[in-house]
């Protein structure tokens, strides 16, 4: 859990977190372990507060996505022990091999299940006119708007590393009390992306 690793490096970590979560600062964190979502929201919110956009040169959520993509697809994270490194890189290196739009988005939908035991990511339609895909997260409530945006940023950054250019936009958000989260992904026009978009059931403009 990189969020905990980052918080452990801060001398003020115990000030940032409620005492009930200090255990994460004292105990080893297993990359393959499952942790309560309610704890994760508190942890990541605390970490975001420590990141100054002027210092890091971008929005903190965009920074998380860029860091994760470079670490996970590249498999480079010296903070992980060898077994953890192998487990982390295995998931994402498979993702890195998905260089065609259909395999890329299929991998993106499967990736959600790697880290969450509830909710499912679905590709619900496309718009040929704008070369856009629409994805939804069903059955899972994300309470933080930045974390909703982060899911779109992840795909933008993973796409950059494997040659698929896209721009994400949040259109529905459970953080805004919508019943589900939804993203539009506008793909750069290439023969491959246009063919893929046309192959998906079309939505109204």
Kindly label every feature range from the protein language model.
Residues 23-32, 69-73, 175-186:
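Short, mixed-charge aromatic SLiMs
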Residues 12-26, 58-67, 86, 167-175:
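Short alpha-helical "patches" and their helix-cap loops
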Residues 160-161:
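Extended serine/threonine-enriched, polar tracts that run as long, contiguous segments within proteins
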Residues 13-15, 106, 153, 181:
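Active-site-proximal helix/loop capping residues that flank conserved catalytic or ligand/cofactor
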Residues 1-4, 113-152, 164-205:
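Short terminal or interdomain "cap/linker" segment that borders an active site or interface and mediates
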């Amino acid at each position: 859990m990189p969020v905990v690793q980052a918080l452990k490096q801060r001398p003020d970590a115990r000030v940032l977190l409620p005492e009930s979560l200090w255990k994460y600062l004292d105990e080893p964190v297993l990359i393959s372990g499952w942790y309560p979502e309610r704890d994760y929201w508190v942890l990541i919110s605390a970490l975001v507060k420590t990141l100054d956009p002027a210092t890091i040169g971008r929005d903190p959520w965009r920074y998380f996505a860029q860091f994760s993509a470079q670490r996970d697809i590249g498999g480079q994270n010296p903070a992980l022990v060898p077994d953890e490194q192998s487990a982390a890189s295995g998931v994402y290196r498979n993702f890195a091999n998905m260089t065609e739009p259909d395999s890329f988005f299929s991998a993106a939908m499967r990736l959600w299940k790697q880290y969450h035991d509830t909710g499912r990511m679905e590709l619900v339609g496309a718009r040929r006119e704008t070369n856009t895909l629409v994805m939804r997260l069903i059955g899972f409530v994300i309470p933080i708007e930045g974390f909703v945006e982060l899911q779109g940023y992840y795909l933008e950054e993973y796409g950059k590393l494997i040659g698929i250019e896209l721009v994400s936009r949040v259109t529905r958000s459970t953080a805004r009390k919508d019943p589900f989260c939804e993203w539009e992904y506008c793909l750069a026009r290439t023969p491959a992306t246009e063919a893929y978009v046309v192959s998906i059931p079309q939505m109204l403009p």
